[in-house]
Amino acid sequence: MEYQGQHGHATDKVEEYGQPVAGHGGFTGGPTGTHGAAGVGGAQLQATRDGHKTDGVLRRSGSSSSSSSEDDGVGGRRKKGMKEKIKEKLPGGAHKDAAGQQQQTAMAGEYAGTHGTEATGEKKGVMDKIKEKLPGGQH
């Protein structure tokens, strides 16, 4: 059986799956890749990089461009939400102290229940909205 190789040359060599094999430069027995690369050097894998070995363990450095936690004002740390992370990256972050104070009062109101939120026109917290949708009356 005669096949036409990659460069139009007639060849009758086939690999184990029946695909034609081009015999260039004395190399024999290698399959042709999907992009025409002979079985030599088709994949460019690098076993080690600059002599560094990690033994399959992912290592992270201790530094990062933005912290995922901040001081909670009571001597501890708390995780930042997505909103705080975005605000931190935006220009004009001079209102950090005012935003921190406002957020603390909003969090206290959010989890405190429905103490006058409808009468004073304040925004309802997430927990209040969820509680309204639950069956079984007002909690």
Swiss-Prot record:
Transmembrane segments: none annotated. Residues 23-42 have a biased composition (Gly residues). GO terms for cellular component: cytosol. Residues 59-68, 99-109 have a biased composition (Low complexity). Induction: By abscisic acid (ABA) and water stress. Keywords: Stress response. Residues 49-58, 83-98, 120-139 have a biased composition (Basic and acidic residues). One of its GO terms (biological process) is cold acclimation. Pfam families: Dehydrin. The keyword Membrane does not apply. Residues 1-139 are annotated as: Disordered. PROSITE patterns: DEHYDRIN_1, DEHYDRIN_2. Disulfide bonds: none annotated. The keyword Protease does not apply. Belongs to the plant dehydrin family. PANTHER family: DEHYDRIN, DEHYDRIN XERO 2-RELATED. This is Dehydrin DHN1. It comes from Hordeum vulgare (Barley). The lineage of its organism: Eukaryota, Viridiplantae, Streptophyta, Embryophyta, Tracheophyta.
